[in-house]
């Protein structure tokens, strides 16, 4: 509107250096959380606040569970925030009504490893990503979507609710995701089941997504953009 030239610098991640091999710290996470080896793990890597749309993740998982002869375990990684516990309580009730197992892992997941107040082992999110079979990101709105970039970094298939910033700034790059517009449809369930049962399709999608991120959301891009801006300012 003001006809001022600008340069957009996106959120970035270290896609030049793929995740390192696990050091084994998180190997006991499933046992500690009561997750059996035959359960499909769906990770919701967010806090428990209404704008994260976690009820959509519960809906997806419960519908998949009804169609598959396998149990689904939804792992919600973080605690509820200062917005209160009502949303969390509503989600617990919804999961029970749908006979869905949910691991509320917030007391055991933190920014860094260590022990909690009860002397229990604390994991970080990077300990959990490798064991996820699928990731849900059904946010109603976001400032950008750092957890989505993190999901691409760990090469995991993902469901995304098409919040506005995603539609404007991320979707145009052509990522392969299971996308929804505020509801879990029959096609959503079919597409997710297809990914859960086809490793080659998962590899195709995640490799495609990673390559896009390497080009457009990497530290390399950030360095290049900043160098150009600094050079331009010195002219």
Where are the language model's segments positioned?
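Carbohydrate-associated surface elements
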Residues: 12
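Aromatic "clamp/platform" in nucleotide-sugar-dependent glycosyltransferases that forms part
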Residues: 140
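A short helix/loop element that forms part of the nucleotide-sugar donor recognition site in Leloir-type
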Residues: 19-35, 90
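Conserved donor-binding/catalytic core segment of Leloir-type glycosyltransferases
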Residues: 36-52, 58-61, 74-76
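A charged, aromatic-enriched C-terminal amphipathic alpha-helix characteristic of glycosyltransferases
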Residues: 197-231
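A short hydrophobic beta-strand element within the catalytic core of glycosyltransferases
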Residues: 135-136
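Nucleotide-activated donor-binding/catalytic signature segment of Leloir-type glycosyltransferases, i.e.
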Residues: 78, 85-127
């Amino acid at each position: 509107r003001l006809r001022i030239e600008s340069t957009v610098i996106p959120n970035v991640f270290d896609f030049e250096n793929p995740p390192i091999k696990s050091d084994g710290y998180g190997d006991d996470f499933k046992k500690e959380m009561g997750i059996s080896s035959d359960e499909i793990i769906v990770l919701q890597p967010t806090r428990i606040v209404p704008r994260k749309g976690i009820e959509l993740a519960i809906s997806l998982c419960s519908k998949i569970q009804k169609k598959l002869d396998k149990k689904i375990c939804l792992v919600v990684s973080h605690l509820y925030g200062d917005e209160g516990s009502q949303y969390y309580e509503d989600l617990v009730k919804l999961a029970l009504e749908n006979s869905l197992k949910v691991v509320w892992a917030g007391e055991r997941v933190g920014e860094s490893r260590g022990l909690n107040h009860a002397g229990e082992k604390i994991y970080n999110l990077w300990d959990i990503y490798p064991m996820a079979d699928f990731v849900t990101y059904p946010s109603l709105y976001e400032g950008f979507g750092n957890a989505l970039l993190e999901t691409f970094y760990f090469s995991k298939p993902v469901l995304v609710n098409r919040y506005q910033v995603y539609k404007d700034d991320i979707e145009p790059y052509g990522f392969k995701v299971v996308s929804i517009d505020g509801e879990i449809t029959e096609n959503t369930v079919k597409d997710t089941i297809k990914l859960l049962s086809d490793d080659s399709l998962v590899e195709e999608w995640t490799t495609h997504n990673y390559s896009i991120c390497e080009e457009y959301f990497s530290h390399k891009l950030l360095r290049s953009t900043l160098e150009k801006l600094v050079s331009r300012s010195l002219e």
